[in-house]
Amino acid sequence: MKHAELTKKSQANGIIALSVLGLGLFATAVPSTANADDLELMKPGTLVVAVQPYMPYTAVKDGKLVGLDSDILTAAADKLGLKMEINVTDFPGMLASVQTQRADITIGGIAWSDARQKVGLFTDPPYYSPPAMAVSGTASFPDVASLEGKNLGTVTGYVWAKSIAQVPNASPHTFPNAEGVFQDISSGRLDVGFLDPLLITYQQQQRPDMKVRIEYLKPPTNEQVAAHPDYKYFQAYMTGFYLPKQSPKLAKAVSDQIDGMYKDGSLAALITKWGGDPKQFLVPSPEMAAQRRGVDRPADWNPPSIAK
């Protein structure tokens, strides 16, 4: 989730029922072997997790976390010997819980940003969110030039609303929720819809009758972004799990688990499970290392990757 996640998460309510909002739920992992003092936890042996329901990234079902981010964190917690206490809230509540030390960690497609890292800690990226489009039929839109003159849509408040408005001769449209985007693509009124990538694949699974499919956009060049500044939102971005500033040891421990999952293939398996392409989600773009080097990572840091 990039800028305007508050809106994006609120709009997601049209697809995901927030029936467990505000409840404290518990999911048991393996017996705790981690030293609470070493990991700076709020409660000994327990990882307090703040989430907002947003499938297929995060949700709570039968008292357990489900979704891509949930599976990644559950695997990390298991390896660290921690159980999890789950607090369900909304997106601003997630961030506030971490920033005020009412949660040990929050997850759910959270985009790394310089502003956020100043008031919290980010793990290494569990995955990268590629620029994805919802399309129908056999038409192909490989790059931004192919979008010119087309009917383009997204949800009101999403950053892609700025991007599609800058595409030459295109007709930009915004909708109150993702369902409206899907409906107009299915009916042929829209050529392309810009949404979170796994939301598109999840829609494919849940509503195959709509015949909506995902297509990945080749990111714009630096020259194209210079000419159309809001094209920057057509680029991939880093996600991360978000922790309090006071928890560097926990952030390092979770990052180590994430890095190990890149190496052992388990992250690729989870991305595939939830409808993503590992080559799109687990390979950073060239500019990403520089964004964090000397900011919240050492000067020689390299983002984790499945690329050899």
Tell where the protein language model's regions lie, with residue ranges:
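Bacterial N-terminal signal peptides
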Residues: 16-28
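Immediate post-signal peptide segment of exported/extracytoplasmic ligand-binding proteins
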Residues: 35-64, 140-141, 145-151, 294-308
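Extracytoplasmic small-molecule ligand-binding "clamshell" domains
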Residues: 36-110, 264, 269, 273, ...
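Bilobed "Venus flytrap"/periplasmic-binding protein-like clamshell domains
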Residues: 48, 52-56, 65-78, 111, ...
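Paired acidic/hydrophobic, glycine-rich loop segments that form the ligand-binding mouth/hinge
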Residues: 50, 104-109, 191-196, 203, ...
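Extended ligand-binding regions for polar small-molecule ligands
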Residues: 71-79, 138-141, 145-146, 150-151, ...
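Acidic, polar ligand-binding/catalytic clefts
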Residues: 74, 78, 83-146, 217-233, ...
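Ligand-binding clefts/hinges and TM-proximal coupling segments of bilobed small-molecule sensing domains
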Residues: 162-175, 249-301, 305-308
